[in-house]
Amino acid sequence: MDREPLSSGRLHCSARYKHKRSASSSSAGTTSSGHKDRRSDYDYCGSRRHQRSSSRRRSRSRSSSESPPPEPRHRSGRSSRDRERMHKSREHPQASRCIGVFGLNTNTSQHKVRELFNKYGPIERIQMVIDAQTQRSRGFCFIYFEKLSDARAAKDSCSGIEVDGRRIRVDFSITQRAHTPTPGVYLGRQPRGKAPRSFSPRRGRRVYHDRSASPYDNYRDRYDYRNDRYDRNLRRSPSRNRYTRNRSYSRSRSPQLRRTSSRY
């Protein structure tokens, strides 16, 4: 009578233990399957990302291979096409009412130029290019006609003729705007470490070079400037003066030391 409830109790405990193991195994299976699913999803997404990045790289490489290489630029910043276009415009300028007369004699006056070109049509104005320093003609001028046909006729008729012993060249002007007078002096940026021609670094004054001066005078000026610069360096550097003072002091004391040593 007593053994029956014990067997039934043992059976109940074993059933509960089996139920727990089955539940734990099922949960472990779900977690493992969940991990597997996550890994598979990650692998799928990673492969898709890899495919996208590789396709982007291919498209970039194709676009870079298809695009032409950049044009080499000149020191002035202009490309080769711009320089070719400018060269062509200089060789074959467009027809305009302004013509340029080049190769003139520096003694040819504006009045003579007007008499020469006035027979082809009414002239609006003549601009002689004058040197600012010498106040003389630089050998070319610009003539503005009122009509384009008159400017074309003057160009075709007067190009190559001889005026005051010089054969002139007539062509259309490259620029369509009014020409500004040239100052006769270089107005660009000066290179580093160099002063303008008319400026002397010594005492900051202007020096006017005389062509009749002898080479000895130039040598003397350079020698004086070198001595002045050496004196300024001596005055500015105290360490060099200290060294010279110590050296003179040692020279003055050296004979006395020798005499005292000889006594003993």
UniProtKB/Swiss-Prot annotation:
Keywords: Developmental protein, Differentiation, mRNA processing, mRNA splicing, Phosphoprotein, RNA-binding, Sexual differentiation, Spermatogenesis. Changing residue 140 to A: In pm2; no female-specific DSX splicing. Some low male fertility. SUPFAM superfamilies: RNA-binding domain, RBD. InterPro entries: Nucleotide-bd_a/b_plait_sf (IPR012677), RBD_domain_sf (IPR035979), RBM (IPR050441), RRM_dom (IPR000504). GO terms for cellular component: precatalytic spliceosome; spliceosomal complex. Residues 71-85, 207-234 have a biased composition (Basic and acidic residues). Residues 23-33 have a biased composition (Low complexity). Isoform Tmaj and isoform Tmin are expressed in males and females. Isoform msTmaj and isoform msTmin are present only in male germ cells. It holds the Pfam family RRM_1. GO terms for biological process: cell differentiation; female sex determination; female somatic sex determination; male somatic sex determination; mRNA processing; mRNA splicing, via spliceosome; positive regulation of mRNA splicing, via spliceosome; regulation of alternative mRNA splicing, via spliceosome. The keyword RNA-binding applies. Required for female sex determination in somatic cells and for spermatogenesis in male germ cells. Positive regulator of female-specific splicing and/or polyadenylation of doublesex (dsx) pre-mRNA. Splicing requires an enhancer complex, dsxRE (dsx repeat element: which contains six copies of a 13-nucleotide repeat and a purine-rich enhancer (PRE)). DsxRE is formed through cooperative interactions between tra, tra2 and the sr proteins, and these interactions require both the repeat sequences and PRE. PRE is required for specific binding of tra2 to the dsxRE. This is Transformer-2 sex-determining protein. It comes from Drosophila melanogaster.
